[in-house]
Amino acid sequence: MESENMDSENMKTENMESQNVDFESVSSVTALEALSKLLNPEEEDDSDYGQTNGLSTIGAMGPGNIGPPQIEELKVIPETSEENNEDIWNSEEIPEGAEYDDMWDVREIPEYEIIFRQQVGTEDIFLGLSKKDSSTGCCSELVAKIKLPNTNPSDIQIDIQETILDLRTPQKKLLITLPELVECTSAKAFYIPETETLEITMTMKRELDIANFF
């Protein structure tokens, strides 16, 4: 009887010892895992992020994701040259003759008029041999009449281009665009003291036509 009691006590002791060993092993494993997390916290975060990212990617996929990946088209933006960027105005927006004008010039603009003139001979007046009429299409000259009172003819400066007439005196300034192209070298000017008027006659540049030359 005593031997049986001894055997049962020995078995209880062995069971308790084995349970203690298992508990100690579990505790040691848990301690090692906790220590590993303390030493390498980023590994766990990376694994969690990878799982979350994978789930979000899978959830965002739809029927449009089936097939080859789409290639994004690149839009080409035309480059503007530095010269164009530095321009304040477009050359087409600048009025003709603006390069001759001076906005700071305070001289007065004189009275003037531009008229068309024909070269008419006796054959045109009495015989009517040509087909000329009174229209501007049959005129061959432009005449500019400019009022310049109290002006010395020697003080008058004139610059005539194909489409520009530029006149300057100490008191007056005139810059006009001519209605027709003219021959610069054909211009003739004379001052009429009685009327204090300057007349400038210019031959127009026109193609040969039957009305003017036949």
UniProtKB/Swiss-Prot annotation:
UniProt GO molecular function: dynein intermediate chain binding; protein-folding chaperone binding
Keywords in alphabetical order: Ciliopathy, Cytoplasm, Disease variant, Golgi apparatus, Kartagener syndrome, Primary ciliary dyskinesia
GO cellular component: cytoplasm; trans-Golgi network
Major localization class: cytoplasm
Keyword Transcription set for record: no
Any one biological process term the GO annotation gives: flagellated sperm motility
Location of region: Disordered: 1-22, 34-68
Tissue specificity of this protein: Expressed in testis, small intestine, prostate, adrenal gland, spleen, lung, bladder, breast and ovary. Expressed in ciliated epithelial cells.
Signal sequence extent: none
Localization annotation: Cytoplasm; Golgi apparatus, trans-Golgi network
Record function comment: Plays a role in cytoplasmic pre-assembly of axonemal dynein.
Subunit structure: Interacts with HSPA1A/B and HSP90AA1. Interacts with DNAAF2 and DNAAF4. Interacts wuth DNAI2.
Family: Belongs to the PIH1 family.
Disease link: Ciliary dyskinesia, primary, 36, X-linked: A form of primary ciliary dyskinesia, a disorder characterized by abnormalities of motile cilia. Respiratory infections leading to chronic inflammation and bronchiectasis are recurrent, due to defects in the respiratory cilia. Some patients exhibit randomization of left-right body asymmetry and situs inversus. Primary ciliary dyskinesia associated with situs inversus is referred to as Kartagener syndrome. CILD36 inheritance is X-linked recessive. About half of CILD36 patients have laterality defects due to ciliary dysfunction at the embryonic node.
Protein's UniProt name: Dynein axonemal assembly factor 6
